[in-house]
């Protein structure tokens, strides 16, 4: 019994005297007033030794995760593998209210982007806000096989 009490005392001591910051996953929230983001999009991937294309539907998701402030999407362009602009999705800013999401879909049959397609998305806010989640979701099925994966956007230019 005394041995168990010793172990319990040691365990409690470790828990009580360990700095709280070691328990926190992320004690710093990155706020920003805007960014230009690069988001990979795979309209197809290759499979097998003959590198057969496996066509995918691409969904671009933009999520304003700030609970109190809106953001404006000011640029949303789709590029193909060689970097040629395929489509400008907006011609004027689109406002996303707090916690609002927006999505655009590239159909599976649209192969124009190729395996190295990408989106460039730019957003702005009047105040520092939680950075939105901007990601692409790829999904496809062939026979009885299905595949799905995501790719997060990366900042390429920060706004001042």
Regions found by a protein language model. Give the residues of each.
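Bacterial N-terminal signal peptides that target proteins for export
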Residues: 1-9
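Bacterial N-terminal signal peptides
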Residues: 9-19
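Sec/Tat signal peptide C-region and signal peptidase I cleavage site
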Residues: 20-26
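Terminal connector regions
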Residues: 26, 110-160
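Short, solvent-exposed loop/turn segments enriched in Ser/Thr/Gly
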Residues: 52-59, 117
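Asparagine-centered strand-capping/turn motif at beta-strand->loop junctions
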Residues: 62-69
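Short, hydrophobic/aromatic beta-strand segments
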Residues: 69-76, 87-89, 131-135
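Intrinsically disordered, low-complexity Pro/Gly/Ser/Thr-rich segments with frequent PxxP/GP/PP motifs
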Residues: 80-118
């Amino acid at each position: 019994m005394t041995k168990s009490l010793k172990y319990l005392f040691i365990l409690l001591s470790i828990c009580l005297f360990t700095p709280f910051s070691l328990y926190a996953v992320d004690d710093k929230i990155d706020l920003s007033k805007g960014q230009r983001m690069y988001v990979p999009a795979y309209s197809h991937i290759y499979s097998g030794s003959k590198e057969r294309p496996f066509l995918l539907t691409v969904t671009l998701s933009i999520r304003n995760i700030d609970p109190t402030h809106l953001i404006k999407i000011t640029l949303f362009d789709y590029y193909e593998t060689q970097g040629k602009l395929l489509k400008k999705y907006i011609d004027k800013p689109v406002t996303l209210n707090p916690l609002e999401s927006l999505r655009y879909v590239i159909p599976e049959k649209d192969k124009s982007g190729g395996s190295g397609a990408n989106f460039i998305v730019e957003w702005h806010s009047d105040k520092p806000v939680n950075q939105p989640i901007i990601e692409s979701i790829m999904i496809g099925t062939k026979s009885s096989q299905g595949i799905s994966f995501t790719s997060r956007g990366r900042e390429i230019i920060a706004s001042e």
